[in-house]
Each structure stands twice: as C-alpha cells, then as structure tokens.
C-alpha cells in the first residue's frame, strides 16, 4: 500500500503490475536521455559562438531528426501495446466476481456461487480499531484466492465510478448500463487497498476497496461460511 511522501509506485503484486513497472522504467530512461540531450544542446548554444547561421539546407540533419524521433516512438509504443493486449486477455478464469458501484459504496456478487453477495461500506473513523487505516477499511472485504486468474465484471447503478487497486495494476471504469471486465491474479497473500478513482459526488473519497488474497483452501472455507 502507499505511504506518506511516497514518490514511486506501490510494490507490484501481480504480473501485470510488474510489466507496468518495467514499462515505466523503460520510458523514464528514454525521457531522461532525451532531456539530457536537449540540455546539452542548450548549454552549447549558450556557451559557444554560433556558426553556420545562414545555412539554408542541411539534408543529413533533417534526415536524422526525422528518423530518430520515429525510432524512439516505436521503442515506446511496442511495449505499451504489448501490455495493453495482456490486460485485455482473459483465458479460462477460475472465478468471476461482479462489482457494482453505488453512491457511495461497492457491492460484490460471486457469480459462480448461488447466493454469495454483499455490500462493502467504509468503516467510519470513529469506529476504527488500533492499527486500522483511516478512510481505507471496509466492513466486508473481498476475499479471493491467490495465484488464480479472477475475472472482475465492473458496472454502476447510478453515476460513473472507477474500481482501482494500484498494487495489482487495476483501474476499470464502472459505467451505468455497461459491463466492463478485467482480470487479476495476486502472486502473494495479503490485504490490498484501492479506492474509487472517478469523481462521483460528495462522498467520492469514502469508497475504499479492500481485497484479501488468501490460499485456495482458506477461500473455500470462507465461501462455505458465507453461504
């Protein structure tokens, strides 16, 4: 989860988030090299006497500054497209969970079970126990099995919302009348926090998301106790 004064991303907990972190580092390195080159050219212009100011044609230079940016854009676009296709790919999910956004809470339905659904409200600050996180704790966590492909169906019953869990690399818009889907897979157990990431009204900041990733046998016990 995030902590105060954090500058980087949260620790990756899914293969998709790991890919996003690698892409971020890759793109940042390209931006750093371009920025260094621009600063170097500016420093040369400021510290040396300008020459060839009357040049009307420089075919080689024009060729270079046309081809080089094209190559840089390709180096950025290819890994980006690869990750986009990976995020849209859904193959034989082990579990499907439908989440609906409301003003201002989330409801969840495990569609593989006959009657397993619940609402998830934020716990007010006055009711928090020692060690719990302000504006992030909920009364009903979303319990899911780790190391399994899970499909999330996301929609809304009123206004636009967005279901987002940063450490898993997830952000899916909840649109009334439309069913969006995404996949997630956690590589380790734990609690993973998120929030609504689309301004949806006065209590937009009070729609936390808590995923509890557990081994399969514990998930089976939990699901049996909820039925």
UniProtKB/Swiss-Prot annotation:
UniProt-annotated location(s): Mitochondrion inner membrane
Top EC category: translocase
Protein name: Cytochrome c oxidase subunit 2
Chief place where the protein resides: mitochondrion
Phosphotyrosine modification, residue list: 218
Family per record: Belongs to the cytochrome c oxidase subunit 2 family.
Gene (name only): MT-CO2
Amino acids binding Cu cation A1: 161, 196, 200, 207
Side of membrane Mitochondrial intermembrane, spans: 1-14, 88-227
Cellular component terms (Gene Ontology): mitochondrial inner membrane; respiratory chain complex IV
Binding-site positions, Cu cation A2: 196, 198, 200, 204
Residue spans, topological domain Mitochondrial matrix: 46-59
